[in-house]
Each structure stands twice: as C-alpha cells, then as structure tokens.
Amino acid sequence: MVACFDLPGHTHRHEAYGAYKAGRAQIDDNLILQLERAKNVFTAFGVPIYSHPGFEADDIIGTIVHGLKKEKNLETIIASGDMDALQLVDDKKVQVYTLKKGISGTILYDEKKVTARFGFPPKLLVDYKGLR
C-alpha cells in the first residue's frame, strides 16, 4: 500500500496550459485538515507517502502502476475519487475503486465496467478526454 498526495503550487500542466484548473473552486479548509490527518494516519501505520513538486498525485500513481505492471502475479487496486485514474485500468491486473455519484456507494472498475460506462476500453480514455 502507498499513498500519493498533491503538493501546493503549480504543476507541469500549468506551464503547458495557463488556464489549467482555472474554473475549479478553491479547496475547502476542512478538506485540507482532513488530508493532513490522513497523512498522519498513513505515517503512523508505516504507509509510504509519495508527492513530488510539479506533479499531481495521479501522475505519481500512474508512474507507480506502470512500474508494477512488470510484476506477473501482482494485482493493483487504485482507490481514488479522480476518474482520470480509469485510464490505468488494465484487464484484471489494475482496477480502480471509486465513489459512485455522491458518496453513498462505491464501485470497483475493471476493463469491462470502464467499457460499459464509456463505450470503449480504458486505453482510449486519454484520447477521449483530449478531444472533449
């Protein structure tokens, strides 16, 4: 198990596109406190925490997942509210556990569920999002 967090400040995406996340609401102070508490809990349980200036947590998750794909019998489950993580789903080897609409339910996405939701496999999500 590992945990990945965004760091404050701009990322390489802001440099490439100045309006990146320009329409996004400011993060709530209570959420910031909850994230800090979560980091403390992860640290207390010895869970490694990864962050890197200029990169978002999902970039780091993608890098870790890519490195783990070489492991033959390793199943990876990503727990994230960021639906961009669905692009990492790879048959039964990589799945994404996320919230359904709202916070009342959860869903574990495998390749079949991603395809059912979007009408195409996870590997095409990057192109789809780029064209939207």
Language-model segments: residues:
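Extended two-metal-dependent nuclease catalytic cores across DNA- and RNA-processing enzymes
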Residues: A22-R132
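Extended, highly charged clamp/arch subdomains and adjacent linkers
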Residues: M1-F5, G9-K21, Q34-N40
